[in-house]
């Protein structure tokens, strides 16, 4: 499956700068596998409820009946975007609205990507795992928690969804001046120039067996006598609960990855070339990807 970054960068319109800005602080969003939606702004898919497969039988014995029970479901695409405004006088002092928006675009796009990724992590994967009881509690109870996610991307089941038609011009991210680039009066009665960014995006979560989570991971209060951070066995269970295989990833805050390495690697640590490191990049072959768009130890305790 192609990723969000690969698809956006390959389409016409030379949007490399826009794509780089949106994904530079959103590494998980950047590498999210994407599929075309079936009907533009929504995607119709078949959710498997029960599968009966074949079996070994004796020679000349009747073959068992095989089949699939399923139901049609729909994923609606959402909008990633926002609007920027600049006052007439400010725009004039700074070289005009085009120059102003070009200067401000990069930090705005960066923040847009960060916000979108956070929604994918919390309102998408984490909420899906909790809703389907595919979740483990590490024991934290002081509202100073982190989350660790395991996501197994599967075509048609666990994937991002995009509208291939975009806005009719083939662009994934559409930036356009408001009011045709002319002055207009905003809600406060001020004369301004405006610019808006829009793209259509969805997250298809069709199989609860492929998304798992560990919540209530408290680093601050974790001790040998009172564990509030996942044990090695819990991390193993996290992978099992997502049926970890190809295209499976562990997602967490960088501090979680660092602490996970320090408590699980010190007893096997080797020092080479005078470099001391407890960094781990994978757990039993599953890559660990980090993002600062996870909350930094401020999550409320989840009742399991």
Q: Over which residues does each language-model region extend?
A:
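Core alpha/beta structural scaffold of self-assembling particle/tube/pore-forming proteins
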Residues: 2-26, 30, 36-46, 66-304
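Glycine-rich, compositionally biased intrinsically disordered regions
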Residues: 44-68
